[in-house]
Amino acid sequence: MIYAGILAGGIGSRMGNVPLPKQFLDIDNKPILIHTIEKFILVSEFNEIIIATPAQWISHTQDILKKYNITDQRVKVVAGGTDRNETIMNIIDHIRNVNGINNNDVIVTHDAVRPFLTQRIIKENIEVAAKYGAVDTVIEAIDTIVMSKDKQNIHSIPVRNEMYQGQTPQSFNIKLLQDSYRALSSEQKEILSDACKIIVESGHAVKLVRGELYNIKVTTPYDLKVANAIIQGDIADD
């Protein structure tokens, strides 16, 4: 089976003084989360579309689903965890409790605050994860990347044409991700905040799918302005 895991567990501290977590803020008079869910509903391959949100915001999430007529029975809401990976594991726990987990099951995980992903990106994630077990969505780095260990001096400059910027979705064979996560120590779980990094550390290859420049993550007031400009300018592909 194929599952979507929409990660809406953040509280949006970088957004500044706002009344709601960032995933519930509006762009073009509609919550960011709803824009994102609508993209996933269009994909018939998904057996379930699972939204993980802070426990105290579950009721609000359910309310906005009703308000914006999200009636697709595949859409479920569960409580997120204390960090990104724990949130993903909570989604997987839901899957295991409801349907069990089979060897070929795939989960497509995606930031709730990336509302501009395309159908191509989603479907390529499904195809590549089903074939290879793990995939990340990336774009080529445009700017030169510099590394600094002390935040004051450059310690190295990687070769730019080998650098990519990670986006989401990140998609996995569920058993591969679950087994890789369970093998981590408590210390590793605190350090390895990215699911693809966990897979890489386990020794398994992670394939790449091409993202889009406009597949932005809305985390700051500036991002919110850019997101509204993208919608009003009809920049993003469907």
Swiss-Prot record:
This is Ribitol-5-phosphate cytidylyltransferase 2. Catalyzes the transfer of the cytidylyl group of CTP to D-ribitol 5-phosphate. Pathway: Cell wall biogenesis; poly(ribitol phosphate) teichoic acid biosynthesis. Belongs to the IspD/TarI cytidylyltransferase family. TarI subfamily. Keywords: Cell wall biogenesis/degradation, Nucleotidyltransferase, Teichoic acid biosynthesis, Transferase. The gene is tarI2. The record marks 14, 22 as: Transition state stabilizer. It is an enzyme of class 2 (transferase). The record marks 160, 217 as: Positions ribitol 5-phosphate for the nucleophilic attack. One of its GO terms (biological process) is isoprenoid biosynthetic process. GO terms for molecular function: 2-C-methyl-D-erythritol 4-phosphate cytidylyltransferase activity; D-ribitol-5-phosphate cytidylyltransferase activity. It catalyses: D-ribitol 5-phosphate + CTP + H(+) = CDP-L-ribitol + diphosphate. HAMAP family: TarI. CTP binds at residues 7-10, 81-87. Its EC number is 2.7.7.40.
